[in-house]
């Protein structure tokens, strides 16, 4: 297992240098510690997530797949740990960095099927499917905390 993890780490580090740039998401608790998250709080337009391995809220490796129907996407956010993403199906659209603090679907990079993306810890981003269903696979080390970036008027 250690050899596999070291190999995965080396591959991801190499890929990170060639391409840097989403997600079962969580919301933060209120002042009393309660969390109530509707699907619209987590994703816009009905994206759904399944956990294939591990648990993103617990220590250790996790693998999740997110299916974005056409028009579905996440709101601007960031994660506490790095994430390694492969676009399995469709063309995914993403925005990252300071410009990703404000949602603008007209200023996104088209990411074709088969693309690998490394998202560094606390890298601000958002993503979506535009005209077709998109499936992405996300790997990372838990526990991961997702923080939403407040939008103007919220």
Positions of predicted regions on the chain:
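Conserved short histidine dyad/triad with adjacent acidic residue
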Residues: 62-79, 111, 120-121
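Short beta-strand His + acidic residue motifs that chelate non-heme Fe in jelly-roll/DSBH
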Residues: 74-76, 94-95, 119, 124-130
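A short, N-terminal "cap"/entry segment at the start of jelly-roll beta-barrel domains
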Residues: 22-62, 105, 151-154
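Bacterial N-terminal signal peptides
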Residues: 7-18
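Short acidic-glycine-tyrosine-enriched beta hairpin
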Residues: 100-122
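Double-stranded beta-helix
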Residues: 106, 128-154
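Glycine- and acidic-residue-biased ligand/ion/polar-headgroup-sensing regions
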Residues: 69-70, 79-101
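Positively charged n-region of N-terminal signal peptides that target proteins for export
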Residues: 1-7
């Amino acid at each position: 297992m250690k050899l596999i993890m070291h190999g995965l780490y080396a591959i991801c580090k190499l890929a990170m240098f060639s391409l840097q740039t989403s997600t079962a998401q969580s919301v933060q608790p209120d002042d009393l510690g309660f969390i109530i998250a509707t699907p619209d709080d987590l994703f816009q337009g009905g994206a759904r997530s399944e956990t294939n391995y591990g648990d993103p809220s617990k220590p250790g490796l996790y693998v999740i797949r997110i299916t974005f129907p056409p028009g579905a996407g996440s709101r601007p956010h960031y994660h506490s740990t790095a994430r390694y993403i492969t676009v399995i199906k469709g063309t995914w659209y993403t925005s990252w960095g300071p410009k990703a603090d404000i949602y603008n679907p007209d200023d996104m990079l088209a990411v074709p099927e088969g693309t690998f993306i490394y998202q560094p810890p606390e890298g601000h981003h958002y993503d979506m499917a535009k005209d077709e269903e998109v499936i992405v696979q996300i790997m990372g080390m838990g526990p991961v905390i997702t923080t939403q970036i407040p939008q103007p008027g919220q």
